[in-house]
Amino acid sequence: MQKRLLSELYKEAGVDPCTVPYVELHGTGTLGDTPEANCVTEVFCGNRRSTPLLIGSTKSNMGHPEAAAGLCALCKVLIAMRDHAIPPNLHYSEPNPHIPGLLDGRLKVIIHICLTFD
């Protein structure tokens, strides 16, 4: 269902998901991370993508803000766009073996400040 929703939203907006440089994930370190990341890999990392999709989560920077999680993620992305820099994810050390996109390099967790959104 997530995959269909994302695909339809980007199609309706006229945006090719393969051109999106960064996606903010929920990333709570729970079982839900695997299906979320695998769905994002399928939608955003098609055969036409030439660079890894950069991913991150506000939770590594500030903990889980519970009901405000979506708003905090949106604020992080807006500030990153304004400052042309995505903050790194803390405490990431190795890829989840159940997320092929991390293992094969289609997804890349930002672990150093990343300059983008130019």
Name what the model sees in each region:
Residues 1-118:
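Condensing-enzyme catalytic core of the thiolase-fold
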